[in-house]
């Protein structure tokens, strides 16, 4: 389910997961990163949840995307203990795997996923592949000014979906096997 700006009364989510984007030199957030975290902060302040989980490792420039988002969230009034970080992932699929493990450990399953509109279908697919039924909320923003740039983003996402399917199937099968196989016990 895709929501541009949820207008209905807030639904209680366990957490908002915010996917990272580029960090620029000097630890500056790219416009996409800033859009995503500010949208998540707005949703949290409007009562959709009390926790953020920011995800993203180190890209071309340090620090980790998650660290930059955490700093921005705290600067906008979110208590530090309410901003969880996953700072290892280097792809959307890795973010999904690592975040899903963190969420399961906390018993959280009601997730609002924040990213850009063009990225949301693939991001939701990645989280669904890990067994988490997230709801998407696209960060508001202007589409790319140049038509070729917009086409580039949509083409890249369209080509990435089949690749994710290839990556997701083995992960799903492995997780199913682990869930079905009895735990081995050793006898003294």
Give a label for each model feature.
Residues 147-177:
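A transmembrane-helix-recognition feature enriched in membrane-embedded lipid enzymes
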Residues 1-11, 163, 167, 174-188:
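N-terminal membrane-anchoring alpha-helices
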Residues 2-151:
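A structural signal for short, hydrophobic/glycine-enriched beta-strand patches
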């Amino acid at each position: 389910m895709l929501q541009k700006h949820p207008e209905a009364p807030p639904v209680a989510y366990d957490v908002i997961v915010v996917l990272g984007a580029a960090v620029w030199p000097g630890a500056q957030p790219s416009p996409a990163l800033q859009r995503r975290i500010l949208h998540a902060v707005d949703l949290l302040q409007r009562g959709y949840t009390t926790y953020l989980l920011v995800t993203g490792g180190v890209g071309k420039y340090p620090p980790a995307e998650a660290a930059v988002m955490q700093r921005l969230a705290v600067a906008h009034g979110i208590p530090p203990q309410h901003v969880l970080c996953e700072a290892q992932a280097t792809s959307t699929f890795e973010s999904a795997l690592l975040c899903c493990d963190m969420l399961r450990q906390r018993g959280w399953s009601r997730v609002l996923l924040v990213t850009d509109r063009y990225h949301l279908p693939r991001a939701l697919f990645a989280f669904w592949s890990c067994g988490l039924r997230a709801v998407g909320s696209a960060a508001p923003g202007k589409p790319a000014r140049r038509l070729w740039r917009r086409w580039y983003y949509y083409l890249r996402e369209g080509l990435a979906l089949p690749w994710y399917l290839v990556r997701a199937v083995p992960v799903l099968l492995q997780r199913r096997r682990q869930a079905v196989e009895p735990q081995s016990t050793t006898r003294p």
